[in-house]
Regions:
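Soluble non-cytosolic domains of exported or imported proteins
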Residues: 83, 87, 104-108, 177-185, ...
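Extracytoplasmic/secreted cell-surface and envelope-processing proteins
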Residues: 120-122, 208-213, 232, 238-243, ...
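Conserved SGNH/GDSL esterase-like catalytic core that processes O-acyl groups on lipids
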Residues: 103-212, 284-285
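Intrinsically disordered, low-complexity Ser/Thr/Pro-rich tracts
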Residues: 1-105, 113, 122, 132, ...
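Loop/turn elements at helix/coil->beta-strand transitions in domains of secreted/extracellular proteins
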Residues: 106-109, 194-200, 223-230, 255-258
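Active-site segments of SGNH/GDSL-like serine hydrolases
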Residues: 200, 204-206, 216-248
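Catalytic His-Asp segment of secreted/periplasmic serine-dependent ester chemistry enzymes
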Residues: 238-314
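Extracytoplasmic/secreted envelope proteins and their assembly/folding machinery
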Residues: 90-94, 188, 212-219, 245-249, ...
Length: 314
């Protein structure tokens, strides 16, 4: 897939702060649930070697039936705060996936587009590095982990501190690492080197006014490549994070895409599961607490599980 020249011709390099810190971040413009999630108690939270399973209400606990999926979400994007934590599944997922299989996408690979909260040590790397954590999962989720082994704990050109949707479209952002070239954006490079069938879009935010436009550009690239996007809402309000979540809901409704509503999952946590890291007071509460990380990881894995099974007709 070729980089969109009209977009790249407008790229500028500016200093800005994302949800993870400050970085030289490329930008593409001149303009400046009703579902309840129960937090595990101290008695039920996994220890470093988990002895029991953390289960979130609404999570898949058995193999889905063959009931036909709806063709659209039938949810109001303006009411995204009341959307369930786990994605509403539509028939669109299987259609996108089928196209990807025709194009040769790897059915055992997923990618992540995100900032510091998407690094393997914070996000889902543990599902590849800690056998005890894996063994504590329900059998269905263990099957999902096995299917996608090799994707949970990898570094990539699309995961980096301060990554935004603007950065993902700029060849400068990958710094020429991971065999990426200056003729391809981080998105294009990741699709080439990892060839995923699914992608979590879990990026940070900044002040620019055209986030939704850039988000839609990325979504269209993924759809053209037959890759199923899994959109992820954010818990913090850094740079008006609710506007970012609104844009994600708009895109989910427009294209019939799965949305993992982590914002809703974090509602039960003190301070929304966020804290200010020492020495980084200027960023505010943007880092996940230990309690939040437990829910963050598990609810993401559950989302991957349900979307994968919808895509493959399980």
């Amino acid at each position: 897939m070729k980089t969109q020249k009209p977009i790249l011709s407008a790229l500028l390099v500016l200093m800005l702060a994302s949800a993870c810190g400050q970085a030289v971040t490329p930008t593409i413009e001149a303009d400046p649930p009703t579902q309840t999630v129960t937090l595990p108690t101290a008695a039920t939270q996994p220890s470093p070697v988990p002895t029991r399973t953390l289960t979130l209400p609404g999570a898949p606990t058995s193999t889905p039936t063959a009931t036909p999926l709806p063709s659209e979400l039938a949810l109001d994007p303006d009411e995204w705060k009341s959307w369930p934590v786990q994605p509403i599944l539509t028939s669109r997922i299987a259609e996108i996936y089928a196209r990807g299989q025709e194009l040769g996408n790897d059915p055992n690979a997923f990618s992540i587009f995100g900032d510091c909260q998407s690094k393997p040590e914070v996000f889902m790397g543990v599902y590849e590095t800690d056998p005890d954590v894996i063994a504590a999962l329900p059998a269905q989720l263990q099957e999902t982990v096995a299917n996608f082994t090799g994707s949970f704990n990898r570094e990539s050109p699309t995961v980096k501190d301060a990554t935004t949707v603007a950065g993902l479209l700029n060849p400068i952002w990958h710094e020429g690492k991971y065999t990426c070239t200056l003729d391809e954006s981080p998105v294009e490079c990741e699709l080439r080197i990892h060839n995923p069938s699914f992608v979590f879009i879990n990026t940070g935010t900044h002040w620019i006014t055209r986030n939704q436009e850039y988000l839609e550009t990325i979504i269209q690239q993924l759809l053209e490549a037959g890759v199923v996007p899994i959109l992820a809402t954010k818990a913090d309000d850094r740079y008006q994070g609710e506007k970012t979540n609104q844009a994600l809901a708009n895109m989910a409704a427009k294209y019939g895409l799965p949305l993992w509503n982590y914002w809703a999952a974090a509602l039960v946590l003190p301070e929304h599961g966020l804290y200010t890291k020492e020495g980084q007071g200027g960023l505010g509460d943007v880092y996940l607490t230990d309690q939040a990380i437990l829910i963050y990881r598990l609810s993401a894995l559950q989302a991957l599980d349900s979307v994968w099974r919808a895509a493959t007709g399980q």
